[in-house]
């Protein structure tokens, strides 16, 4: 039996496609169905390491990773066959079926579709053969008429799958009915027929006030409005496009007080931004995306996250004066955490003899040196911290699981080691700590997504992903028209 396909399309980026697809994955799974997510092509530096054919591992966009978890299935590379990871304003690294393709990366984007479409179609066909339902997510808008000829992610996928299309719009921005009608009208007739329902997202107020607009829209298009979704201020999932949402967000602690401020340096090519989502659920924690010294002032922690362009982001950091602010914070004994590219920045030097990322002096907070390597490390990792000292001692002995996505090898700085200045190996080959104990760098992404580590660091439990998925699935029953839900349950 070939799976039926539901496709979530949007009138724009940020309309709500990703989290609605996630909600539908859990809702269909709750019906006892085998469900898989799919997005033909994703553009994001938020990526996860998942299973690849032949027992290997590869990368997919984080949104499809979370959708797979919501669907109660193992995430794997077929769920996102093409991933574009921006490295500069006009250049992206191309990941095909989980692996970097240098050939496609060098190719002009308009010429790629003919090469990648067979992989997209094969991945989708395989998922359809193994599941009852495939929930497909589109990208941007399907009515970008300048891109339509090279489309591999929206209506070409919908046609290939014969998908039941839902077109979502953000009504909070204004002009929602014009966006829905305009998007529908710009599609060729055969593609219009695939749009089976309109969805109004981020609505505030009394839904009765929308009348008679949904009926008028149906008269013009033949498409019913099947759901009105209230504004979800904090739905509990990371933003798919890496938006710096909830700046200064605080979840009230005892008495509504702020106990800890964590400032994450938001450099231009930040990667894996989504791994900080759990911090928004820690009571009394204030999370700040910092782009200036003023925004790290008074922070208890400063975090240097991953980067897709480490040397360039380090240069940006210096240009903002953040290097001095971070050094002063560390000198006062404040906690500093570097993750992946952030770890590399904390060392003495970045050495690039292969033209991967560029040479640069580091921040000098750890006596380490990083040599960039064209070979990319992509793997899931389960390990445990050794004995840590000082501010990070709560992590001593804590077993963690996460993932590595990086270019580069980091080691003790030879000259400094000879002089007795050695970084303490918190996890051999993966994490190092300074002698004072307040600066920690690690290659492992996902520290804050590990419940045991989060409890050790903050003494708090946060809602599990399953609880978030279940709440979203209950929302489908609340927001969607009963007839639409009944038809989906009946297999139509």
From Swiss-Prot:
Pathway: Cofactor biosynthesis; adenosylcobalamin biosynthesis
GO molecular function, one term: catalytic activity
Swiss-Prot/TrEMBL GO biological process terms: cobalamin biosynthetic process
Alphabetically ordered keywords of this record: Cobalamin biosynthesis, Glutamine amidotransferase
Key word Translocase present: no
InterPro entries registered for this protein in UniProt: Class_I_gatase-like, CobQ/CobB/MinD/ParA_Nub-bd_dom, CobQ_GATase1, CobQ_N, CobQ_synth, GATase_3, P-loop_NTPase
Active site (catalytic residues): 340 (nucleophile), 445
Signal peptide: none
Superkingdom assignment: Bacteria
Family note: Belongs to the CobB/CobQ family. CobQ subfamily.
Function (record text): Catalyzes amidations at positions B, D, E, and G on adenosylcobyrinic A,C-diamide. NH(2) groups are provided by glutamine, and one molecule of ATP is hydrogenolyzed for each amidation.
Protein name: Cobyric acid synthase
Protein species of origin: Paracidovorax citrulli (strain AAC00-1)
Gene: cobQ
